[in-house]
């Protein structure tokens, strides 16, 4: 039975919550790592993981479903050309949520949300001489 398995409301209206989760999922799929609060991160996982599962099988119906959920052509392209093949053999668990301390001001628990197996980017430090 699925009693009590509803969504977190996050103190927002349903339209605001939908828009916020859509924006956060687009940012995560574009940058592959974002920083947010822990409850938002846990809700974001319920949105992004099915999207990546859609991206594993590239057909027109799945592309239309992904566009309906993201409303961004560039994200849909990346989802089906990069992320789908990257996670083709992984049966779920595409996100990693790391606790990241507490926010100054309201002491909200923060978290880093990142895609598992993302390519490491070498950061070049700019040295001022």
Curated annotation (Swiss-Prot):
Listed Pfam families: Ribosomal_L17
Any GO BP: translation
InterPro entries: Ribosomal_bL17, Ribosomal_bL17_CS, Ribosomal_bL17_sf
Coiled coil: none
Record-linked PROSITE patterns: RIBOSOMAL_L17
Disulphide bonds in the chain: none
Molecular function as annotated in GO: structural constituent of ribosome
Keywords for the protein's UniProt record, in alphabetical order: Ribonucleoprotein, Ribosomal protein
Gene Ontology cellular component annotations, sorted alphabetically: cytosolic large ribosomal subunit
Superkingdom as given in the UniProt entry: Bacteria
Family as reported in the entry's similarity comment: Belongs to the bacterial ribosomal protein bL17 family.
Subunit composition and interactions: Part of the 50S ribosomal subunit. Contacts protein L32.
Name assigned to this protein: Large ribosomal subunit protein bL17
């Amino acid at each position: 039975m699925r009693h009590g398995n509803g969504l977190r409301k996050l103190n927002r209206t349903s339209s605001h919550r939908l828009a916020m989760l859509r924006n956060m999922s687009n940012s995560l799929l574009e940058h592959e790592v974002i920083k947010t609060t822990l409850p938002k991160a846990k809700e974001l996982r319920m949105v992004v993981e099915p999207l990546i599962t859609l991206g594993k099988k590239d057909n027109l119906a799945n592309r239309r479903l992904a566009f309906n959920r993201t409303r961004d052509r560039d994200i849909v392209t990346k989802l089906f050309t990069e992320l789908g093949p990257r996670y083709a053999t992984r049966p779920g668990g595409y996100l990693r949520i790391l606790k990241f301390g507490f926010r100054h001001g309201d002491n909200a628990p923060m978290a880093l949300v990142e895609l598992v197996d993302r390519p490491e980017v070498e950061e070049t430090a700019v040295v001022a001489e």
